């Protein structure tokens, strides 16, 4: 999404045209191949990425930090306790100040509106590294991972099991952008927000919703799940017993296509949303997903910065 000043923000998959998302994905594949071949690329030497963490994360911090360093740049980490974002200083003022110091801002936060406000007032690119509503960087890594293992994602069917959370919201947006289908199995009361489903359907995604996990898994090309309780939402979580039928185990995987993959954004609560047998099994690509956060995010950074005359 480009604002009135031509700044490219990576807000959500719904805010970036399908052609540009595909270009980012192909760039990620190419950058990964060059890295594996030992090529060194440092187009952003001297550039700085500010990383705002109001919700901490191993994968997000390390993958963005390493990614920016591999591109030749540097990072600075700012935690919520250090910044008091929106408390001792308004989000708008913080955005304006940081824009004078750094070349891009990544934010991992709670309320989606906080990230949107930061992007509204920043004069450098803002990247959504996670909010309570969406997780677009993760899903770009997931699409990359699927295509590495199984080829084009177009026309395939993903089956989601468990809580209708931020990862699912970005998954259905990806379904519209990359032309695949999503079968959603959630217990009553844990459905995804309707605005994301409505947008995905209006933009061509095939979305099926059910409370029956076996129905959702039937013939699927990939089964995806996440923790039953998201970080920071433990006090509002429903009892785990309602999610037990949605555990991804060998019996549920057997309902999918024999070549189906298993995905999880990690960290996983083994024995809850997924069994050891599945997550450590031959259909699991969870650690490829984790690695591909690095490559996808490098391509996202490049997309955000290229049109600002900052390398390639």
Curated annotation (Swiss-Prot):
<dbReference type="GO" id="GO:0042450">
    <property type="term" value="P:arginine biosynthetic process via ornithine"/>
</dbReference>
<dbReference type="InterPro" id="IPR002292">
    <property type="entry name" value="Orn/put_carbamltrans"/>
</dbReference>
<keyword id="KW-0056">Arginine metabolism</keyword>
<feature type="binding site">
    <location>
        <begin position="135"/>
        <end position="138"/>
    </location>
    <ligand>
        <name>carbamoyl phosphate</name>
    </ligand>
</feature>
<feature type="binding site">
    <location>
        <begin position="57"/>
        <end position="60"/>
    </location>
    <ligand>
        <name>carbamoyl phosphate</name>
    </ligand>
</feature>
<dbReference type="Pfam" id="PF00185">
    <property type="entry name" value="OTCace"/>
</dbReference>
<feature type="binding site">
    <location>
        <position position="84"/>
    </location>
    <ligand>
        <name>carbamoyl phosphate</name>
    </ligand>
</feature>
<keyword id="KW-0963">Cytoplasm</keyword>
<dbReference type="InterPro" id="IPR006130">
    <property type="entry name" value="Asp/Orn_carbamoylTrfase"/>
</dbReference>
<dbReference type="GO" id="GO:0004585">
    <property type="term" value="F:ornithine carbamoyltransferase activity"/>
</dbReference>
<feature type="binding site">
    <location>
        <position position="108"/>
    </location>
    <ligand>
        <name>carbamoyl phosphate</name>
    </ligand>
</feature>
<dbReference type="GO" id="GO:0005737">
    <property type="term" value="C:cytoplasm"/>
</dbReference>
<dbReference type="GO" id="GO:0019547">
    <property type="term" value="P:arginine catabolic process to ornithine"/>
</dbReference>
<dbReference type="GO" id="GO:0016597">
    <property type="term" value="F:amino acid binding"/>
</dbReference>
<protein>
    <recommendedName>
        <fullName>Ornithine carbamoyltransferase</fullName>
        <ecNumber>2.1.3.3</ecNumber>
    </recommendedName>
</protein>
<feature type="binding site">
    <location>
        <begin position="230"/>
        <end position="231"/>
    </location>
    <ligand>
        <name>L-ornithine</name>
    </ligand>
</feature>
<feature type="binding site">
    <location>
        <position position="166"/>
    </location>
    <ligand>
        <name>L-ornithine</name>
    </ligand>
</feature>
<comment type="similarity">
    <text>Belongs to the aspartate/ornithine carbamoyltransferase superfamily. OTCase family.</text>
</comment>
<dbReference type="InterPro" id="IPR006132">
    <property type="entry name" value="Asp/Orn_carbamoyltranf_P-bd"/>
</dbReference>
<dbReference type="InterPro" id="IPR024904">
    <property type="entry name" value="OTCase_ArgI"/>
</dbReference>
<feature type="binding site">
    <location>
        <position position="226"/>
    </location>
    <ligand>
        <name>L-ornithine</name>
    </ligand>
</feature>
<keyword id="KW-0808">Transferase</keyword>
<feature type="binding site">
    <location>
        <position position="293"/>
    </location>
    <ligand>
        <name>carbamoyl phosphate</name>
    </ligand>
</feature>
<dbReference type="InterPro" id="IPR036901">
    <property type="entry name" value="Asp/Orn_carbamoylTrfase_sf"/>
</dbReference>
<comment type="function">
    <text>Reversibly catalyzes the transfer of the carbamoyl group from carbamoyl phosphate (CP) to the N(epsilon) atom of ornithine (ORN) to produce L-citrulline.</text>
</comment>
<dbReference type="Pfam" id="PF02729">
    <property type="entry name" value="OTCace_N"/>
</dbReference>
<feature type="binding site">
    <location>
        <begin position="265"/>
        <end position="266"/>
    </location>
    <ligand>
        <name>carbamoyl phosphate</name>
    </ligand>
</feature>
<dbReference type="GO" id="GO:0019240">
    <property type="term" value="P:citrulline biosynthetic process"/>
</dbReference>
<dbReference type="InterPro" id="IPR006131">
    <property type="entry name" value="Asp_carbamoyltransf_Asp/Orn-bd"/>
</dbReference>
<comment type="pathway">
    <text>Amino-acid degradation; L-arginine degradation via ADI pathway; carbamoyl phosphate from L-arginine: step 2/2.</text>
</comment>
